[in-house]
Amino acid sequence: MTNRELASPKRTGRPRNSGRDSANPREEILKEASRLFTAQGVAATTISQIAECVGLRQSSMYYYYKSKEEILSALMEKNRESLTLAEKLLEEDGPVAPRLYAFLYTDVRQLCTAPLDFYELEVAALAQPQVFAGFEEDGDKLRDAAAQLLALGVDSGELRQTDPAATALMLLSLNEGAQHRLWHGRRDEEKASANSAALAESVADYHLSSLLADASSLAAVREAGRAFVTEYEDDEPAA
């Protein structure tokens, strides 16, 4: 599902076509590209449109990104938060249910606040596998990590009996559907940020309420799960 280790090569020079100033031209390009992809779709967006929005000549874009596919690859790299957290949570000790809650909450929130609707990214990745070589592999790793957490929860007695692999696929598919509905209903980052945390909590609550062996423990699981999320965020390096 989420993003990948396809960083663009670092280049020097930054000729610009306007007086706009940015301490990080690459980030500015990604932000404007995401806005255009969201507004009119990936296929309809051209590299020249992105360059114009950023204030660069199209030829100058090549100092940063050589193609629209390279921009998409960089955006994909930004969507690995869920997988990174899942791998960390598998290394933790103690109750499993809060770790599963933290993973599911983070997955929904990350999908909702990513620069691009996951479905748009998936279409681009499947159409050009040579450009997005890590996309399917990361998706497999994410499902496997979710299945491992589920299996641990079943073994510990915290979760009801379930098929970990099938349930992991279902949970992640529901998360993707939830983010798509949020993306479909808005076209600006501010609205996404305002709604993503609430949606993430609702979806994680829904998942855990159906999985917990003791449904009455949901409030405690939520509190402990959110503590994991906060700890993870505090450990993240500053941008």
What are these regions (language model features)?
Residues 39-43, 93, 114, 156-157:
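Short coil/turn segments at alpha/beta junctions that flank glycine-rich nucleotide-binding fingerprints
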Residues 118-122, 162, 184, 218-221:
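Short, hydrophobic secondary-structure boundary micro-motifs
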Residues 108-151, 158, 165-166, 193:
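Short secondary-structure transition hinges
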Residues 28, 36-70, 74:
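Helix-turn-helix
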Residues 2-12, 140-155, 180, 184-239:
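C-terminal peripheral helix-coil segments that are non-catalytic and often amphipathic
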Residues 77-84:
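Short, basic, alpha-helical segments at the C-terminal edge of helix-turn-helix-like DNA-binding modules
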Residues 74, 88-117, 168-171, 200:
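Hydrophobic alpha-helical connector segments
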